[in-house]
């Protein structure tokens, strides 16, 4: 049986002075903490969505429901993937938040080890709350999915997700 991994985000930084830095968050897993930088400069709407859902606790207790070894680990189904509230193993991976879907913000961030990118359906403008973290290079996703962040520390904990 698959281990269920839960996530929790904590904010690390706030705006300092006039210079705007990309926000950093902590993704807490059962294996350890993962420090992530969010690229607000290239995917502002997607980063704002992640921050909003995080701030409101929507990701707390949400499982990594799809893991493809050597490719990626996917999480963020706040509707069906919350292990603390209404977890639905037959529906996990099909839900999103109650917020509207986001328009694509495709960019030049490469999908490589540690890249965070939004999951979506075949419709490029269907990203909502689900996202994935790449285990390795995935150039076939470049400019096809909205990359919005990068693991800075703790990728070894993502590698333990099975």
Protein language model features and the residues they cover:
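Sec-dependent N-terminal signal peptides
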Residues: 4-13
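Cyclophilin-like peptidyl-prolyl cis-trans isomerases
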Residues: 12-162
